[in-house]
Amino acid sequence: MYHGHDLKPPFFEGWYYKLINQAEDQRYAIIPGIILGERGHAFIQVLDGIQGTSTYHVFPADQFWAAGDRFEVRIGANTFTPERIVVQIDDEQARLSGELRFDGLSPWPVRWHSPGIMGWYAWVPRMECYHGVLSLDHTIAGSLQVNDQSIDFSAGRGYIEKDWGQSFPEAWVWFQSNHFQSPGTCITASVAVIPWLNSAFRGFIIGVWHQGRLYRFATYTGARIEELLIRDDSVHWVVSDRQYRLEMEATRAQGGLLLGPTRVEMGKRVAETLNASVQVRLARRAGGELFQGTGRFSGLEVHGALERLLAL
């Protein structure tokens, strides 16, 4: 559901739909959202992962509507739910229209003691940024008309997540892929500078969805970072808990620029690619490999004061 009912600025909320067709030669991210404040407005961002270009479409805040009891958002003539999107954009930047439907959604499991990917941190009030995963992997049906090109996404695969709060973090690394050799396998991982009281800590959340089981590693689960190296061309990251060890190597690639929220406006310029790859190895600490593979067409963001992120 939308979290901004009756809230005052600073506040933003955005949803991220990753869309890849069956032929894997069309890759898009569509990001609807809203930011409240003096320069408040609704928006829809569109990232073309093949071309490495993006467009940012602005709507008056009063053209944003959200249901109070479920996730359904409308921005102008555009509709967004977990099961489908309907887009109708025609301005000086781009023309985009069509309907996509999503089947076989795989939401991050929600339990009374762990309400989603953030665990008990989801109950902490006034955190800078909250995160949620609506579907780790699903199939797509339908098509989009993008300018003069008709793109059939039927039998493609998608992913949906969301962010909300006051601002994006000072620094973070995020990557995601659900295009492994074994269909349905997905990884989503992020590490960021998290303000806490008068200080900050390095918080992380990782989920590996494989063969119908979710392996989670997070600050709140007691997992720890063994290695985190950010290079010009890659991110090397190793985490472990009492049972498992997870090795990840994300290869960076060219992408496009998205706008991200500050406490005042959509002022962060965030480089994101849909052309990265991520090598994953999950094993039991006692011995025995559970999964090894390379995720294609990974979304990847590496942003902000990385020296501070690494130093925490």
Spans of features found by a protein language model:
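Structured soluble/peripheral alpha/beta segments that form catalytic or ligand/cofactor-binding pockets
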Residues: M1-L312
